Amino acid sequence: MARISHQGAAKPFTAWTTIFYLLLVFIAPLAFFGTAHAQDETSPQESYGTVIGIDLGTTYSCVGVMQNGKVEILVNDQGNRITPSYVAFTDEERLVGDAAKNQYAANPRRTIFDIKRLIGRKFDDKDVQKDAKHFPYKVVNKDGKPHVKVDVNQTPKTLTPEEVSAMVLGKMKEIAEGYLGKKVTHAVVTVPAYFNDAQRQATKDAGTIAGLNVLRVVNEPTAAAIAYGLDKTGDERQVIVYDLGGGTFDVSLLSIDNGVFEVLATAGDTHLGGEDFDQRVMDHFVKLYNKKNNVDVTKDLKAMGKLKREVEKAKRTLSSQMSTRIEIEAFHNGEDFSETLTRAKFEELNMDLFKKTLKPVEQVLKDAKVKKSEVDDIVLVGGSTRIPKVQALLEEFFGGKKASKGINPDEAVAFGAAVQGGVLSGEEGTGDVVLMDVNPLTLGIETTGGVMTKLIPRNTVIPTRKSQIFSTAADNQPTVLIQVYEGERSLTKDNNLLGKFELTGIPPAPRGVPQIEVSFDLDANGILKVHASDKGTGKAESITITNDKGRLSQEEIDRMVAEAEEFAEEDKAIKAKIEARNTLENYAFSLKNQVNDENGLGGQIDEDDKQTILDAVKEVTEWLEDNAATATTEDFEEQKEQLSNVAYPITSKLYGSAPADEDDEPSGHDEL
């Protein structure tokens, strides 16, 4: 998943808060993942059999398989290498793929498509509501989730998006079994980089319904990059994956270094793709037809279905020809339709949408702080990237740099998924192929109070690289101890220690001042290198943790996950108590420092007020020494409120501000 730099943006806070709160705590983010190399997965591979790779697309899906070191993109029963993600119900049967799409014009209300726009979402999601208005089929609310309501055998039936997606996945499974001549039970399935956990899990559930064990849910841009073989390049490369499909647009910027993939930034538009280009052309011709014939053809769903089909064909033709003719017999009220569409007119109708695709490209470069000139490769994914003007605009944006065109853009994602499927199934010839695995447990680092500061959730795609700025927890602290843990519990004592090391020689400075950059780099062989450096002195230390050192068995992983659920409430309470104590200590420390600063607040209040605040701070400090071990969360919060009640009347005379609310405290770094 994406690389995230947790430099939390400070929330707006008042002048009073500005005076009394320092940047005191730091986050210690470090993560470690499980093994990613095929050779490390021995026994499980034996039961996988052939693992297929499926690109489950919004408008089209594609399936591939790796055999003897070679990837085959498989053809369906119509001889096509891509299959429409369509499901339809007639009075006699259920249709999936080409057959479903081909009868769409005659049966629009019972033909389901674009189900990927609904999967894993809630019914009241604004995107779902927007889409539902344009679908010819009915989308209904059931338990807060969108369901499709259609007539099946003349009986109303409600289907979940997972069930519909399962029908498409089942078709891809059937295609693979027809090619291989044997049963297929395992698959790698791809999803857009912006899919959240719910959407990913729903996709896996769809696989289960289809009789497939989805071993991996892989990000589409990463699969596409593998398809282009960029992972075999030794030097670090910055790669733009530009994925313009039928219904969605996704841009990702990846850094690839010796097989380690790092998604630096992702942007896109969930409602921009080939269908939108088709709609522009349809709107143009509908306007012409209505004007010529003095009718409103949009009310004729079957006529609109015919036009949709022919416009898509015309668009494809214009990628290789300068003009094409659209002919539809008995289009509306027995009248035929006949119009010419030139490439120039097609580009004119869609130029604003084509240019709109460059905004996410600019966004990912800006987010990752990468210049256009630093991009090494441009990878095209999705059938809409065949449009000449789209390619021209993108290449012009990058100063004339040519996009990679080594693989059919319709097939790039499925190709990469098939490579990973081949690795998982232990196919001959995949010894040098690296698989991006997922970490089996959450990984993080210990911070003040023994808290497990979680950085990487379990089931995050690897390889990856992370880095973060840390600081010290005490004045003049000469050493920081970095302890890497894995597990699902809130306290590190309940998790598994993977390794630790110290960074020493930190020059004397107040707490929170030193800047210590900690980075970790997990390669494809499951070897983690943790590196810490003091940005002030340049001094650095590192540790290497291999995949067989301190790792848990599957049984232990299962037990820890179960325990995490069982003790979730207990963990939550303990963590809240530690956080309440840290908040009180930090507040008292900040208050004392500000009052003693003669160039700041200390020079603006009289001695009596200063002593009043210092006495209150001393009282809290003594209370902490006597009661911290046994106090409750509420006790710590009460002490903080009492201290605030002493300080606020004094400071409000200076600033006239409202009291600081806990939500106004600046976000900072957890303390080690």
UniProtKB/Swiss-Prot annotation:
One of its GO terms (molecular function) is protein-transporting ATPase activity. ATP binds at residues 57-60, 116, 246-248, 312-319, 383-386. The keyword Chaperone applies. It catalyses: ATP + H2O = ADP + phosphate + H(+). Residues 1-38 form the signal peptide. Residues 419-519 are annotated as: Substrate-binding (SBD). Induction: By heat shock and tunicamycin. Not induced by carbon source starvation. Residues 145-299 are annotated as: Nucleotide-binding (NBD). A motif (Prevents secretion from ER) lies at residues 669-672. It is found in: Endoplasmic reticulum lumen. The chaperone activity is regulated by ATP-induced allosteric coupling of the nucleotide-binding (NBD) and substrate-binding (SBD) domains. In the ADP-bound and nucleotide-free (apo) states, the two domains have little interaction. In contrast, in the ATP-bound state the two domains are tightly coupled, which results in drastically accelerated kinetics in both binding and release of polypeptide substrates. J domain-containing co-chaperones stimulate the ATPase activity and are required for efficient substrate recognition. Keywords: ATP-binding, Chaperone, Endoplasmic reticulum, Hydrolase, Nucleotide-binding, Signal, Stress response. Pfam families: HSP70 (PF00012). One of its GO terms (biological process) is IRE1-mediated unfolded protein response. CDD domains: ASKHA_NBD_HSP70_BiP. One of its GO terms (cellular component) is nuclear membrane. InterPro entries: ATPase_NBD, BIP_NBD, Heat_shock_70_CS, HSP70_C_sf, HSP70_peptide-bd_sf, Hsp_70_fam. Its EC number is 3.6.4.10. It is an enzyme of class 3 (hydrolase). Belongs to the heat shock protein 70 family. Probably plays a role in facilitating the assembly of multimeric protein complexes inside the ER. Is required for secretory polypeptide translocation. May physically associate with SEC63 protein in the endoplasmic reticulum and this interaction may be regulated by ATP hydrolysis. This is Endoplasmic reticulum chaperone BiP. It comes from Aspergillus niger.
